[in-house]
Every structure is written in C-alpha cells, then in structure tokens.
Amino acid sequence: MLECLSALLVLFAGGGGSVLAAVQSKTVADPNLCPGYNSQLISPFLSSCKRNLSECVSRYFDEQYAFCRSCVTVNNETMEDLDNCKCLQCALSSLNNSCFHDYCTSKDEYDKLQIVVEQFQLTNGVLDDGEILKPRGNKFSSRKLSYFVGQNNTLFRNPLQFEKNQLISALLTSLTNNQKTISSVDMFEVVDANNEVQYLRKRTISGKTLSPATGYEEENDGDCSVKDKKWEGKIEYHENKKVSSENCSKDTDDKSGSKKERNTKAPLFHTATEIHMTRWSSWRPKKIFTRYLVNEYQSPKIITTVNRFYRTKTDTETGTTLITSTKAKRRWFPRTKIVTSTATSTFLSITTTTTTNAIATKSLVAVLNPDGLNKKAGINFGLFSANGELASPDEGGTPTVVRRDKISDPGAANEQATLFSTTFSQVPHLPELDSGEFISAASQLDKRIFIFTAITVSITTLMMLGFSYRSRVSFRDHSIDDSDDDNDWSDDEVEFDEEYFYSLPVSIPEKGISLDKMAQQLGVE
C-alpha cells in the first residue's frame, strides 16, 4: 500500500491574486476511502497482466461515465473529501471494459474480476450515469481544481492527475497477486509522470548486488537520503521513499579508505494460507481461504491477513412442457323406426241347445189293505204327508228350491243357462206299530217308487216350462267388440234375487186318492 503524502499546492489565479487550497491527497488516492470497498477482504488474483496496465486504465478513466471528471465527493461546509466511490467505480469499469482483454490473458482472472465488480455494485449500488453537475464558483476554485454541484446539492470536485494515478496504482496493487513480489512500497517507486515503475535494487543472501535501477547514479547508492535529481521539484506527482536506517550501508572511516560495507540481509516474504470448510447449505460446501502475508524484511515482522469471500451464483433451468387438449363434440342424429304389427285373432262361437223330451211314466198303484192294520202309519214325503196333511215343523221338512243360474264362457263366446234344482227331504221317523198290526213292505216300496218317479217327471216338466216361458237368458253370438264385457267378472253377474227362485206346486196325494186326482195334482195329463 502506498504511503500517504500530504502536499500543499499553491495555485495562482489570474489578476495577480493567489488562492491557497489544501488538498488531502491521501484520501483520494486510498481505495479504502470508499465505505463499500475494503482491499483487505479481496484476495489478489491478477498475475497475467502486463506492466503498463495502469497506463491503459488511466487513459480510459474519463471515458467511462459522465461523472468521472468530477468524482470526488466533498463536504459542503468543511470542503474536505468524503469519499471516492465514483472514482473507484470509474477505475474498475476502465479495467474491466477497456483494458483487461488487451493486457491480461487469463480467463479465470477475468471471472474473478467480474465477481469483484458485481460485489462492489451490490455494496455501493449502481451509480447514476446521467447525473447533472453544475459548475460552482468559489474561492477554492482554480485552473486545475474545480467544484461542481450535483443532485440534492451534493458537492463534487475533479481528482488531480497524481491523485488519479495513485488511486489506479493502489487499486491494481490490491488486485495483483504479490506472492512472489514485494509490497508496493518495497517493490517499486514512481519514476515518471505517467507512473511508470522500475524495480528497486535487491540484495541477495550471497552478498552480490543487482544492477542499479534506471535513473539512479552509482555515486548515490550508499546515500540513505538519496533523491532523484531528475524529478526534483515534482514531488507532488510521486511519493518519497523512506528507507530505514537498518537498510542503509554502514560507512567505515572515510580516512581509512575502506570500502562501504553492505547489508547482506535479503527481504523475505512468504504467504501462509489456511482453508476452512463450512456449509452454507445442506448440499453445497463453502471454502473460506485465510491468507497470511509475512514480511520479514522489517523488524518487527508484519503479518497481513487476507480473507477471501466467494459469491455463489445459482442458475436454475426450468423446462416448460405445453400440453394441449382438444375436446370434440359429436352430434348424434336419432333415427326412428316404426314397426307395425298386425295380429289376427279368431274366436269360435258355439251355441248349444239342449232339448229334453218328456218321458211318459205310468203310475204305479199301491193298494194298502184297509183292514189289515188297526192303525196305519203315514209316510212323510217332504212338505206333505202320505195322508195329505202338511208335515209338522219338528219333522224338519225343507221346501224344494229350484234356481236358475247364468253361465258365461268368455273363451268360447257362449252363454248357457242352466236350471239347478235342489230338493231337501227328510224321511220322518216312523212310529212304532202296535202288536197285531202289519204292513206290506212291497206295497210301501212300490208306492215310493211311484212317488219319486212322479216327482222327477214333474221337475223335468217344470224345467222345460221355465225355458219356454220364464227364461231371461238370450243366446247370442259374441264378437271381438264384446271382449271387454266378457272380462267383467264382478259379483253382479252371479247375484240372484227372488225372481230366480220358484216353488214347485207339488202335493202328495192323500190316502185313498184316485189316480185321476193324483195325476191332476201332479199336472200329468
């Protein structure tokens, strides 16, 4: 790091007046004046660049931004320099955009330079290029020093040429890998206005001296207060070199004529680096390098610690797949098919006529012996007794009931009327005969056969008469249109009223009735 030198410049203005301006060059030439820049936290990495890199950076310094000609921020009240962040940004931009590709050859060093530039912009922000600066006239302004007013009444001034050169030199020194070289103070000094450097003389362990540096005379080698006469009067453009008394040659007695004894102690620099592994995340480890620069040339020894920080970039690639779905609506047109079925049904109509012929039955005559028995027992035949009297209620006689029923057959489309005759008869209990009274069984049997035959003929005759005169049954053919009436099987079709029941006028002949009278009662001609 360059030593700071305070110079007092006396600038004369036109008209014979003089103005005294105090400029603290150390503040502008030091990169650490910017709050967002710390050279101790940056690990040097430039090693493949040419010597005249600083000339290129200085040449393109003013062309980077509009504010590069007035980049020093000044306090409005005390007129002291506050920071040089804009000047430092101009120097980094000139190195990165204009000079690196022409003077350096390492791709790895270029990537590291991008990290330094991005870190500086993240810390200090991207300075505005379009800031309008207005000139301001005050008593401190001169031909070489001018002040400008920016936004928010911020005061700026232009850096002097030597301040700009020293700032560029200090910046390149902090970025240059000096592992095999001495620090900037012990390694080179300023020898011309363009800040061209020349190596200082070095002493080896063997005692052999190197050839003197260009611009120095041999007679001034042993003089500790040596000063280049060529650049005398231009002290404001470079720094004075201070050499400790330990490094000077020890002179013997001049009168003895012995030669000067040179110090054979050679400067010794070595670098120690410690690597610490840490984890900032669960999947990517972090390496932290701690570098110690030991200068054994001076006493006491100087140990410089350099911490290197890495800025990790994460690139995320996202693949997008476009899926397109197409919906098609299909329209269906219905088709109607009409099927006509024709069914032909044939119904058979059958009419049945029943004819009953009267059967002539001869009457059987049963003759009872009127004198055979003292007491004759009558025979009970239904409603009438054998003697022509009505049967008593206790004999349980039941009148003969004849009903007529109507039968409809929908399947055969036929109606048939049937007469039902039901005869309930009960044979009465015969009284016991007295002694000495007998009756012929054969005569009783013949009489019963005759009576039953007469009853059967009478019932048959009445049935025929009912069909002929009193029948309400009409036989007709049914058609398909009457199918609904045929399916009606309600209770009304089978109900009977008093018109359907008839009492038969049958009377049992009395005892000793003649055949003609019996036939008349039975209705037989």
From Swiss-Prot:
GO terms for cellular component: membrane. Residues 470-525 are cytoplasmic. Residues 1-21 form the signal peptide. Residues 22-448 are extracellular. Keywords: Membrane, Signal, Transmembrane, Transmembrane helix. It is found in: Membrane. Residues 242-264 are annotated as: Disordered. The chain crosses the membrane at residues 449-469. It is a single-pass type I membrane protein. This is Uncharacterized protein SCY_3380.
